[in-house]
């Protein structure tokens, strides 16, 4: 589907962006989240310059995204290691039961 214009209010400013209809709810939620972050940041820091607040919020969001990506990579690596260990355990159990023959290239990869 084609993108359609969506009007947003962020930190007292109007913004019109194009967005696919199926992503409209997520966009509105993101705008609400950004609005709340900016308001919280303004109250915590006493910074009144909107541009500075936006940059600080962007840095915070970027940092959070970087942390989440690292967690995802670590989790994926951990799962890959567990899968390999499980695969080796299964192969060893089958070998011990004589169900598969031990020969090069017989690994399940």
UniProtKB/Swiss-Prot annotation:
Broad class of the protein's primary localization: cytoplasm
Keywords of this entry: Cell cycle, Cell division, Coiled coil, Cytoplasm, Septation
Domain of life of the organism encoding this protein: Bacteria
Pfam assignment, any one: ZapA
Cellular location(s): Cytoplasm
Electron transport in keyword set: no
Cystines in this chain: none
Transmembrane intervals: none
InterPro entries membership: Cell_div_ZapA-like, Cell_div_ZapA-like_sf, Cell_div_ZapA_eubact, Cell_div_ZapA_N
Coiled coil regions in record: 21-99
GO annotation (BP), single: division septum assembly
Gene Ontology CC: cell division site; cell septum; cytosol; plasma membrane
PANTHER family xref list: CELL DIVISION PROTEIN ZAPA
Subunit comment: Homodimer. Interacts with FtsZ.
Family that this chain belongs to: Belongs to the ZapA family. Type 1 subfamily.
Protein role: Activator of cell division through the inhibition of FtsZ GTPase activity, therefore promoting FtsZ assembly into bundles of protofilaments necessary for the formation of the division Z ring. It is recruited early at mid-cell but it is not essential for cell division.
Protein name from the UniProt record: Cell division protein ZapA
Gene that encodes the chain: zapA
